[in-house]
Amino acid sequence: LSRNHTELMLGACGGDISSEGTTATLHPVKRLEAQKIIVPGDISSAAYFMAAGLIVPGSEICIENVGINPTRDGMIRVCQAMGGNIALENIREICGEPVADIIVRHSSLHGTVVEGDIIPTLIDELPIIAVMAAFAEGQTIIRDAAELRVKESDRISVMAENLSVMGVDITPTTDGMIINGGRTPRGARIQSHMDHRIAMSFAVAALASDGETDIIGSDCVNISYPTFYQDLFKLAKSSFI
């Protein structure tokens, strides 16, 4: 699966592009037309707030202007498969990209299986999905995700290490993990291994866990989302989360 953001943007500027599988073909045009480019919100960043809305009791949040490109929307599909109360509103196109406002409400989640073709659409969201699985009733299995081992950290081992110290029943596998959820995790000392997605995932986990959580190397979030903690804490102080 190849993400098609570039093809969509060029098409919005008058480019003539065809694609098949992982091959994109650009056909000649006289000129491209200048456009006002509006970049949608990144669903990989929105995923943490989606998860927070689902696992923190009493939550109801609206995340506006999020890109929901089908090559990136696996997080939405998995949340729904786990019983998450998620709705897409104001669906539209901006510069060729599908965009929506995502409404999330606290839900009683249940386990699911995440595997196969959906993996490329949510590879960066798997750590926060593992956190959601810890709060969900029943078993969640993640497989076909060996790429997690060669990210900024070995995310399979690191998620297993940190969820275990929070009291979660998790077993790492060669290409994923098995999580038996349903018990509220306890606060713990979390090692981020300087991986921004690990730090952000456990900041969300801390919102709904018992006791205090300390994330070592928490400033690693600056690589992708420098204002993450400010935004998360601002939301946590609101009337809905």
Protein language model features and the residues they cover:
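Short, structured segments at the rim of ligand-binding sites
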Residues: L1-I241
